[in-house]
Amino acid sequence: MSELLKKIEPLEKKRKELFAQFSKNMLIAVILTIIIVGLFILFLEQGFYFVLFFLIVPIFFVLKAQSYANKFKETIKNELVHLVLNDKFDDVYYDRHQSIPQGVIDQTGLVKRPDRFSGEDFIKGTYKGVSFEVSDVTLRERQEHVDSKGHRTVTYPVYFKGRWYVYKFPKTFKGTLKICETRPNNAKGLEKLDTESMAFNKKFKLYASDKQYAFYHLTPIMMEKLLELEKLHRGSIYFYYTGNELHIGVNDSQDYLEIPFRKAIDEKAMKAFEGDVDLIPAIINELKLTSDKFK
């Protein structure tokens, strides 16, 4: 058994205890609901108010059960994330409720400004001297619909749901480079370029402040690495080099760092969980952000 699996044994024990309490309270709520519905049928004359009064009791147990699920997220998941992160990175900070700020994403010009923004699972740290920030983000746009009778409804459909990475390296560059599968939201002042790779041109659109800067980063090997990274993710992917930063947006409709409350925290669960974390150093290693080029 690995050292990490030994460390998570107490967390799995806590999970079992919390889930037992969760299941117990949910069972009580279900049984009480069945009894109340049965009484309602028997005493139909008392009607709605009879049911409403007694439904307060099973609702109480449902809320109590939910409190155990919330405690799992606030304590066990938090401890588990810190265990994994501290094992892989330096200067680690994690906050389940925090995210990369909307303004940071807006200023890249890669995606349109959202009407509603949310995020979670913010991670900050360093790996081999490269600092990084990453979080889940969800971007929504406001849409109005008017039917044939003039009734207006407003919805906020999601157009970006996934992960946003920000890597910072010692060297500051003067140019700007955007690599996207579709045209970026803002390409003002940038030149559209093609590479000698047909496979790369077919997959990505390339915009840069100047040609020399673009191909300083986009060597043939680097283009291969970007294509490999694209294959690692479902959905679309965005790259943005500016100053001493690299932004990567992954729009894959996925929630990262999820640990199921109902399932054991075992080797299989940890493999999937660590896979989400390992994407962070994989990008640093694959794009060689630790090389002299970025120092």
Features from the language model and the residues they span:
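Hydrophobic alpha-helical transmembrane segments
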Residues: 41-57
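Cytosolic juxtamembrane N-terminal segments of multi-pass membrane proteins
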Residues: 1-23
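Juxtamembrane membrane-interface segments of multi-pass membrane proteins
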Residues: 1-9, 73-93
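Flexible coil/linker segments and helix-coil junctions enriched in charged and small residues
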Residues: 37, 44-48, 146-155
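Charged, low-complexity intrinsically disordered regions
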Residues: 82, 86-91, 95-141, 145, ...
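Transmembrane alpha-helical segments and their cytosolic interface motifs
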Residues: 20-36
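Residue-level signal for alpha-helical transmembrane segments in multi-pass membrane proteins
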Residues: 38-43, 60-64
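Transmembrane-cytosolic junction motif
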Residues: 19-22, 59-83
